[in-house]
Every structure is written in structure tokens, then in C-alpha cells.
Amino acid sequence: MRRFLFWSLCFCLLFPVGLSSCDGSDSAAVIFGGTTGKLTWTLTEDGVLTITGEGPMPDYRDGGTSETPPWYPHVNRISSLTIGEGVTRIGDYAFMLCSFVTKVVIPESVTSMGDWAFWHCQSLKRITFPDRMVRFGEWAFYENESLQSVCIPEGVTTIPSSAFARCHNLTCVIMPGSLQTICGGAFSQCHKLTDVTIPDGVTVIETGAFPGLS
């Protein structure tokens, strides 16, 4: 038995490459990556897109232009998004059409997100906003068809136009006391939305903000 253990140890020491079990490492390999503005991004073989660095993400454009996010050609590979502490803003169109994403991690350093940021992330069932977030853009979660519940953080004063439109399975929205305005189409075609309480501080509810409200 001792001789067997001795030769096994020697084998691990002599041939470490490819034997991740010897050092306990099982991290997935990076298959794509680069920079975007002042930030760095990587996509690993197991589908995790990670954004790291300090400062805001750039604003991007939709899929018909040359200014799409650098990971856009690989959206069908992405199943999870992790934004690192230090990133302060999610750019316009940042994660559009990431249809297979089921998990999103947003750090406390993020205070805002742009328009169409999570457009058509149709596999995402829930998302947790950081407490410091005070603004998200128009159409930010448009067509997130699997999204079931949303808790909007204290500090947000406006739910923008069509922010959650066509989230067909959204049933519950928790709104903060800081909320003042719900813009037109904010929850348009969210026909399963049955659990929502409008805070006393809301003074403006625009036409079409909720299904059946005209």
C-alpha cells in the first residue's frame, strides 16, 4: 500500500498538466475575452460571462450596428452573468438577447443601468438589484418572459417606459417608498401581475402603465 501511494504521488508531481484533481482546481477555461471601455470581460467554457474593473460600462447599440457588446457574437453560449465589485453602471444594450442566461450577479457598486440592458433575457426568472441602484433605463427588461418577481430598491423614483413590458410570467412587484412615477407601458402585457402595491408617494401613473389601464 505504501509503495502504491508513493508512486501515485510521484505521478502527480511529474505529470500535473491535465490532472486538476491533484491540486483541487476545477475552474473552467476562458474561451473568449478582452476589454470594453476601462473594464475587462471573460467568457468561460461553462457559460459564465464576467465583467471586472472600476467604473461604468460603455453604452452599446443593438445587433444591427458595429457598436454591439464585444460578447454579443457569443450570446448563445452565455448562461450566467457576474458583474464584479467596482463596476458602477450597466450600459445600454449590454446583455441584450442573452436568451439562455438564468443567473445574474450585480454588485453593490452598480447604481444605474441603461436602456434595453437585459432585453429578451427570456430564461431569467429572478434578478436581485443592489441597494444602491437608483436608476434603470427604458425597456431594460423588455420581453423577459420567465421573470416572476421583482423587488425594486429604495432610492428609485421612476419606473421608466416599458421597463418590464411583455414579462408575461411576472406576478409580483415590490415597489419602494421612494417611487414617484410609473411611466407608460412600464408593465404593459404583464397579464399575470396580480400582486403589486402602489406606494403613497406615487403621484404619476401614465397611460398604459399596467395591463388594462388606459
Which residues make up each language-model segment?
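Compositionally biased, low-complexity segments
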Residues: F4, P16-V17, T158
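Sec-dependent signal peptide cleavage junction
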Residues: G18-A28
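Intrinsically disordered, low-complexity regions enriched in Ser/Pro/Gly/Gln/His and often acidic
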Residues: M1, F15, G34, G64-T65, ...
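Bacterial N-terminal signal peptides that target proteins for export
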Residues: M1-S8
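Surface-exposed repetitive/solenoidal architectures
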Residues: D26-F100, W116-H120, Y142
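Consensus positions within tandem repeat domains that build extended binding/scaffold surfaces
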Residues: G91-A94, G114-W119, G137-A140, P160-A163, ...
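Bacterial N-terminal signal peptides
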Residues: S8-G18
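Structural signature of tandem-repeat unit edges
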Residues: V48-G55, V75-R89, S99-S112, Q122-R135, ...
